Design a protein with these regions (language model features):
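Alpha-helix capping/helix-boundary segments
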Residues: 46, 101-102, 156-158
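Conserved nucleotide-sugar phosphate-binding/catalytic loop shared by glycosyltransferases and other
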Residues: 48-69
Length: 165
């Protein structure tokens, strides 16, 4: 079994990280202890590509694009290429990431894609009684359409996000 997590927030010494990064680190290391291969792919804080092994977890941090207005496109393209390269070497069974993570990634046959609902754009727009940003809303809906399954951090997040799936 090989699981690939998508996050830009995997803890890195000297850089802040939040709940997403802590969650992925905790579950990734536990999965490794159960002999499950784990890769983490995300964008780097530094302007370089980096790959390292941390407690059995392969962490790949990709240099961020600086192309104004199209960084999202080039970043997604590079993440997709990285996933494809990993999959050719060690087939991935599951790719898991937060709400927006699948929007512009090409799907690879035989991989299951899962979205982990932590509270995405639609969720917080509703909770804060504000409008949906069209671009973020578009990305989230596109991402949701690509998912084979969803998991949520709570029943509250699940029930309030379900209407947007």
């Amino acid at each position: 079994m090989h699981i690939c997590f998508l996050t830009n927030e995997y803890p890195k010494e000297g850089f802040p990280h939040g709940g997403l990064g802590t969650f992925v680190k905790t579950i990734a290391e536990e999965l490794v202890s159960k002999n499950i291969q784990v890769s983490v792919v995300g964008l780097n804080y530094n302007p370089i590509d980096e790959t390292e092994q941390l407690n059995g977890v392969t962490v790949i941090r990709i240099k961020r694009s600086k192309v104004k207005g199209l960084a999202w496109f080039f970043n997604s393209k590079n993440i997709g290429k990285t996933i494809d390269a990993i999959h050719r070497k060690a087939p991935i069974h599951i790719i898991e990431g937060p709400e927006l993570s699948l929007a512009f990634l090409p799907k690879i046959k035989d991989i299951k894609y899962i979205i982990r609902l932590h509270g995405g754009h639609h969720f917080f727009a509703e909770a804060e009684n504000r409008g949906i940003n069209w671009w973020k809303g578009f990305q989230e809906k596109l991402s949701f359409k690509k998912a084979d399954a969803f998991i949520a951090v709570s029943n509250y997040v699940k029930s309030h996000t379900a209407k947007f799936l």
